[in-house]
UniProtKB/Swiss-Prot annotation:
Keyword Ligase: yes
EC number: 6.3.5.2
Catalytic activity: XMP + L-glutamine + ATP + H2O = GMP + L-glutamate + AMP + diphosphate + 2 H(+)
Protein name in UniProt: GMP synthase [glutamine-hydrolyzing]
Length: 524
């Protein structure tokens, strides 16, 4: 079996919003990468034994006091190093170069001229000048710049406003770029990263979907042995892929618990049972807990309170069911790599909590189960590819995100069965028409929201005084920022008419045209 972790790239995070993007780009090249804090220490780096190191960008200024620096071992380990933006600046400062703050931050598109036929950039270009020099279309985002090269370095790139936009010490294999090769705005960014990872670091393409699945199955079997595993199955992408993976790895040793909260999408419970219990032969215990959830949410209007109640009750019910499974020794969870990174990052205490996380909180300590997280090394796009490899339906694997509390946070204010039933039907019509008009995969997330207010309407000769729903559709790459989807007016008109005509109790449909920021994607 191929050792998919034998060759790896270490990414030291200096706080850039693009750090995860660097890791994903490296993995897309078939090479395993991990993100760790810039101050992880020399011992850790030596033990990690990377084939190469990438220093990320970051929001700080190298010219300030007490700002982040790379551990000394980065430059003594003898492996190739690539500094990006802040990573370039700290490399320059630490190795004897000079960095200064610029009067005007450079942010956005720029054109870079390549110099000196460096191993990193040679032959990579978007255009050429009349004199034959290569030009690159790139993305810049910096407030400092290198104004003096460190000893041993040569100039490899420049722009009109940044005379030193790239530098290299070819002998020590240290390279640095002021621009961001990881973002799509830098058109040749993938080729630059490929040159660094595959040629300069000499990594082979071992990180492939087939190899990842084979590795995960082997590791699960070695760790679990003949013991039983319990998994909370929600119907979401992550838990569904874990279920499929464990079914392939350990078969009948897996039992899934599917808690039907009464806050799921239309027919979702039946779809989950059909896919896993009937089609894949997974042992699934379905718990109809609608009454318990609705009772617990009675009179509760605050979104955070609703989240906590739903999370606590889910854990309670899951705990009850898991206790009934004889000889269960392991709890499987759909933790993915961004969860691991965010959890590590939150320990710094610098992040502000906008909303408590959708995923269910920790299980009670009384539950004496060991944890198995087969997806904890994987990004979401990798999880989806594995789902397809394991035979899950495309529609399930590429389904839009759905919050852990379900419709509980898409019904504004108090949750009632009547509201949930109306919302389920409106949401189903919206999604059905998105599929029918080939728009579902063109938006990143789409759903309906129930507004607990009544609006007057007219049906035939009579007046109606019924509820309002809002439709929400957004386009985004990372869900950190999003723009509202400009769906065709004729399409919105059709969806609105269907909802109002087919669902007694709804008299008005609105469309949410708020971006993120300032709004969040979910309403609560």
């Amino acid at each position: 079996m191929t050792d998919i972790h034998a060759q790896k790239i270490l990414i030291l995070d200096f706080g850039s919003q693009y750090t995860q993007l660097i890791a994903r780009r490296v993995r897309e090249l078939g090479v395993y990468s991990e993100i760790h804090p810039y101050d992880c220490g020399d011992d850790f780096i030596t033990e990690f034994a990377p084939q190469g190191i990438i220093l990320s960008g970051g929001p700080e200024s190298v010219t300030g006091t007490g700002t982040p620096r790379a551990p000394a071992s980065v430059f003594t380990l003898g492996v190739p190093v690539l500094g990006i933006c802040y990573g370039m600046q700290t490399m320059a400062a630490q190795l004897g170069g000079k960095v200064e703050a610029v009067e005007h931050r450079e942010f956005g598109y720029a054109q870079v001229r390549a110099h000196g036929h460096s191993q990193l950039l040679n032959g990579i270009e978007d255009h050429t000048t009349p004199e034959g020099h290569g030009l690159l279309d790139v993305w810049m985002s910096h407030g400092d710049q290198v104004v003096g090269l460190p000893p041993g370095f040569k100039l490899i790139a420049s722009t009109e406003s940044a005379p030193i936009a790239g530098m290299a010490d070819e002998e020590r294999r240290f390279y640095a770029l002021q621009f961001h090769p990881e973002v799509t705005h830098t058109r040749q960014g993938k080729r630059i990263l490929e040159r660094f990872v595959r040629k300069l670091c000499q990594c082979e393409a071992r990180w492939t979907t087939g190899n990842i699945v084979e590795d995960a199955i082997t590791r699960v079997r070695n760790r679990i042995g003949a013991e039983r595993v319990v998994l909370g199955l929600s119907g979401g992408v992550d838990s569904s892929v874990v279920a499929a993976l464990l079914q392939h790895a350990i078969g009948e040793q897996l039992t899934c618990v599917f808690v039907d909260t009464g806050l799921l999408r239309l027919n979702e419970g039946d779809q989950v049972m059909a896919t896993f219990a009937e089609h894949m032969g997974v042992r699934v215990i379905r718990v109809n807990a609608e009454e318990r959830f609705l009772q617990a949410l009675q009179g509760i209007a605050d979104p955070e309170d609703k989240r906590k109640i739903i999370g606590r009750l889910f854990v309670e019910i899951f705990d009850e069911e898991a206790a009934k499974i004889e000889d269960a020794r392991w709890l499987a969870q759909g933790t993915i790599y961004p969860d691991v990174i965010e959890s590590a990052g939150s320990k710094t205490g610098k992040a502000h909590v906008i909303k408590s996380h959708h995923n269910v909180g920790g299980l009670p300590e009384t539950m004496k189960l060991q944890l198995v997280e087969p997806l904890r090394e994987l990004f979401k796009d990798e999880v989806r590819q594995i789902g397809l490899e394991l035979g899950l339906p495309y529609e399930m694997v590429y389904r839009h995100p759905f919050p852990g509390p379900g419709l509980g946070v898409r019904i504004l204010g108090e949750v009632r069965k009547e509201y949930a039933d109306l919302l389920r039907r409106a949401d189903a019509i919206f999604i059905e028409e998105l599929y029918r008009h080939d728009l579902y995969d063109k938006v990143s997330q789409a759903f309906a929201v129930f507004l607990p207010v009544k609006s007057v309407g007219v049906m035939g000769d009579g007046r109606r005084y019924d509820y309002v729903v809002a439709l929400r559709a957004v386009e985004t790459i990372d869900f950190m920022t999003a723009r509202w989807a400009h769906l065709p007016y004729d399409f919105l008109d059709l969806v609105s008419r269907r909802i109002i005509n087919e669902i007694p109790g709804i008299s008005r449909v609105t469309y949410d045209i708020s971006g993120k920021p300032p709004a969040t994607i979910e309403w609560e």
